[in-house]
Amino acid sequence: MILAHDLIEKILARATNLDECIVIIKDQTQANLRWANSTLTTNGVIQERNVTVLAFISAGGKMAAGGVTRTNVDASDIDDLVNEATAAAKAAGPADDYAPIAKDWQHGSWDGAHKPTDSSIFKTFAPELGDLLKRSIAEQIELFGYAEHTHATTWLGSKGGLRLRDDSPNGRVEMTAKSHQRSRSTWEGVETHDFSNVSVSKIESAIKQRLNWQANKIDIPAGRYDTIFPSGSVADIYTYMLWVSSARDAYEGQSVFSKKGGGTRVGEKLSNQALNLYS
């Protein structure tokens, strides 16, 4: 496989008919473990590459732009990529909101290769997970979940001198537990960059504590009640709010942010409580 930065340079060298060309390559590897009914089910490593070519053509003081994205690109695909991006730009026509494109900016280790993640990231976690699964069977607790670690490296290069690189390692563990003939259930999750902060014993303690809490049941009549949300649930609700806050969906009357009679609820006061949300 051609190194990402070399492939970008080759594509840019072929984009002689374009006023500007931006190439973005993302190399990503992921290692994962999955389990169900307290038994490890699958594990493996996934590797992928995405190549995006953006073509820019000057037209009447404005700029037309178009792009294409492909996977597993090699040298023989370069001309087709450039031609397809060029055709997309011509079909799109000049953009009214065109702004000058940044030039001559470098960031990150441009020539360095992607450093793939692999199953060794679980060298401490996996044995501890195995012990937990054995204990859960003895205690009649069913565990379901997965652990994954992803390392994505993104390169962006342009004819105008942009040479940018970003490395983003991230991972997570998510585990669901069921007990007492599945009459009780709970969930625990951990975010991580390298699994050094993941403690299986802490996950186990949190799960058992929440399952034990569910032994105490209080019947509450139907009605309206004041509720205090823990911070984790607020984050989950906010994430979903972001997913459904598309301006177009709101304008077309397809979401909770749509105003009765048409338009959106932008500017409307949603709560009497002062609250700042950041993404």
Regions found by a protein language model. Name each.
Residues A147-S279:
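Active-site-adjacent "lid" and substrate-binding segments of diverse enzymatic cores
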Residues Q28, V68-V73, H180, G232:
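Short, ordered loop/turn segments at secondary-structure junctions
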